Amino acid sequence: MIKLSHLAKIFATPQNSVHALDDINLTIEDGDIYGIIGMSGAGKSTLVRCINRLEKPTGGEIFINDTEITKLSEKQLRSIRKEITMIFQGFNLLQQVNCLRNVCFPLEIAGVKKQEAEEKAYELLELVGLKEKALSYPIQLSGGQQQRVAIARALATNPKVLLCDEATSALDPNTTNSILDLIKEINHKLGITVIVITHQMNVIERICNKVAILENGKVVENGTVEEIFSEPKSEAGKLLVYPDVTKEDELVVESSYSLKIRFNGAEAANKPLVADLASTKNIYANIAYASTKSIGSKAYGTMILSFASEEEKIIAQEYLKNTANIIVEDLSKKGE
């Protein structure tokens, strides 16, 4: 388990002081895939560098299991860091050696014999689907393949925690998804705790079970992915989860007979509610606004429907109320 308690980091300049992290409190359980998301400058990378103590916090505490690491000596930190590994946006592979030697590198530093290191490296390259590329050089690989080698290298020392700092930002969407699926598979197979630093909500949506949203160095919201997606409370959360949510008010005024439907984990990700209304009640709704996401088989988000008359709106409201995990709000009464 990783616990951050009142963590702070201040960068001092001749002109002023920048609070990169301000009173961060988070608990990351063993086996979590924990997403940390925010816009540029939110403090994400500073936070991850504090977790592995590449950056020394200004204040607060960091517990790795039961060990508080902010006051450890460099020698003590080296022992802790063996349990924490990291992959980056830029892969950071050694270009002058092949993939096998890249994966062997941390093992050789740790004093593992060459034959044993190579056997382990081949196993890891097979795990990431690149055993046949063992003797290829990084320049001969695609970006996604290079990141797979970087992941294999990161796993060489049997870490308990994998830090991913914008690990898919430089990749195309299809390659991004394949890398995310690999990380999720590694989490399940090896039980490694994963911390994902990203500015992309689709990354959180695809693999994370929990998420914290950072803004100006502060955690403005955290919880399970389902909780945050169903009803983000902070302005930063709303902007990240549903970036076009501000359009709601502009669209509502176009109809006096409107309902706001909030999907709160409904088993309706693939259920055609509007089509069902038409077929069962002979009511044809206009979709004035929709911003929804599917996580697993569940739907989260908001939809605004407008109707031709008050009578149609009331019938639709009664019908929709019978669908589990859907909250229906009569927008025509909102201003009364």
List each model region and its residues:
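Helix-to-loop junction immediately C-terminal to a conserved catalytic motif
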Residues: 52
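Short coil-to-helix segment of the ABC ATPase nucleotide-binding domain corresponding to the Q-loop/switch region
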Residues: 97-104
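Conserved signature/switch motifs of ABC ATPase nucleotide-binding domains
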Residues: 136-139, 157, 164
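Helix N-cap at the start of a conserved alpha-helix in ABC-type nucleotide-binding domains
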Residues: 173-175
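ABC ATPase "signature
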Residues: 222-223, 231
